[in-house]
Amino acid sequence: MKRILALLLAMMMVLSLAACGGNKETPSGSGTTDPGTSQQGQTGSGTTKKADGAQMDAATDHANSYTDVQTLSGLNTIGKPAGYKYKGSGEAGETRHIRFAPETDSFTVDSLDSYAAALWNLCIDTAKDGELIRYRLSGEHTVYENLSDTRKVYEDSGLVAYVWWYELNGEYLRLQLKQSADDGVIELTIEPYGSAE
């Protein structure tokens, strides 16, 4: 019995030492997006620990989520908001979303605003004719001139959101970016919205 306990203790010590090791997290650079999260930056192990299966699964999910969103959106250099870390992702039909959580307990809407500005510029560079619009089923679309035209604050919940549409490869895509007032989580959603023909 003592041998079994000693063996179990030794295995636990080895596993805990392995879990404590691994790559050190490096701080992200300044700016609104972290290029280390782009598709090109997903080849390494990043900040995950090799001995922790859950961490590795999250890293794989992270890389796949970025690839899915990049492919759907045409925005090949999507990064993460500065001061944020990957939290999770999901899909519903063809719609894809990625969530980011603040790296610290404090957060501000400035992070959302800066990230929205970076995505706005990427969409302008990607969109047909460089136009970001308010999509209407009637076909009479409003072209947004300024990022501030797409920003909405929901007074009852404190939620801040940006929404715009853009045309890519003959299809309208809806981009929504929102931040929870409770925990600061930022969610980016890309949704196919119908043919532009």
Predicted regions and their residues:
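Positively charged n-region of N-terminal signal peptides that target proteins for export
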Residues: M1-I4, L8-L9
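Positively charged, low-complexity intrinsically disordered regions
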Residues: I4, Q40-T43, K50, M56, ...
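C-terminal motif of bacterial Sec signal peptides marking the signal peptidase cleavage site
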Residues: S16-A19
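N-terminal leader/targeting segments
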Residues: G21-I98, T104, S195-A196
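Amphipathic N-proximal alpha-helical interface segments
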Residues: L75-D110, K152-E197
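Long, charged/polar, surface-exposed segments that mediate recognition or autoinhibition
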Residues: Y86-V153
